[in-house]
From Swiss-Prot:
The keyword Protease applies. HAMAP family: Rhomboid_GlpG (MF_01594). The keyword Flavoprotein does not apply. GO terms for cellular component: plasma membrane. The gene is glpG. InterPro entries: GlpG_N_sf, Peptidase_S54_GlpG_N, Peptidase_S54_rhomboid_dom, Rhomboid-like_sf, Rhomboid_protease_GlpG. It comes from Escherichia coli O7:K1 (strain IAI39 / ExPEC). The active site is at S201, H254. This is Rhomboid protease GlpG.
Amino acid sequence: MLMITSFANPRVAQAFVDYMATQGVILTIQQHNQSDVWLADESQAERVRAELARFLENPADPRYLAASWQSGHTDSGLHYRRYPFFAALRERAGPVTWVMMIACVVVFIAMQILGDQEVMLWLAWPFDPTLKFEFWRYFTHALMHFSLMHILFNLLWWWYLGGAVEKRLGSGKLIVITLISALLSGYVQQKFSGPWFGGLSGVVYALMGYVWLRGERDPQSGIYLQRGLIIFALIWIVAGWFDLFGMSMANGAHIAGLAVGLAMAFVDSLNARKRK
């Protein structure tokens, strides 16, 4: 048995399972925190993943609803309930995911009230040799964001990727990825631009690299990122490097974070194969 993906909404999971049944592929749903879709015949994995990518691009396509009717039902037998917005957030996010989101929001509010410079004096990467033993600074730069778009973009990806890692691999794994990527991406960025930078994007890029490569090399880990999204991440890095959008980006942190995530995923997937 091979786990293909997970859906927060069981109706969406059932729609995909029904469609694949019309294509001659039998999938099953197991209910845990989310609806996990499993494939018994692993020889069809590539075909199923290709169909999944098309499904995720437009799950509302009429052919998927038609497949449910063709399968003889539109009711999966599962008990559904409508999730309000915050309940949907809570469904995917574990405690570490939530703590980081809250910390970033609190710091952002403090920056609006006190000013960026005042907060950076306390949280920025050590900008003076006398501060090198204030160890929190090697990590707290990731909490600072300088615009509403900046924090929304990073927290959305953090929730999506960090939540998946925490739910599937545990809080400890998410903490390790976060600390290592914050430290190393911060170190590289301060070499590029000095100590005055901030944002969770180095960690987010680490999670992108980790989730994508771990999903490719170890599908049974239960985490997965579409190749199109990792391509988008690479394009964004190139755009930032050549300043195509006229925006100030932490290019060093992005590249270092992505490299950290890929390296950690490679090691973890090797260890997973050795245990089999």
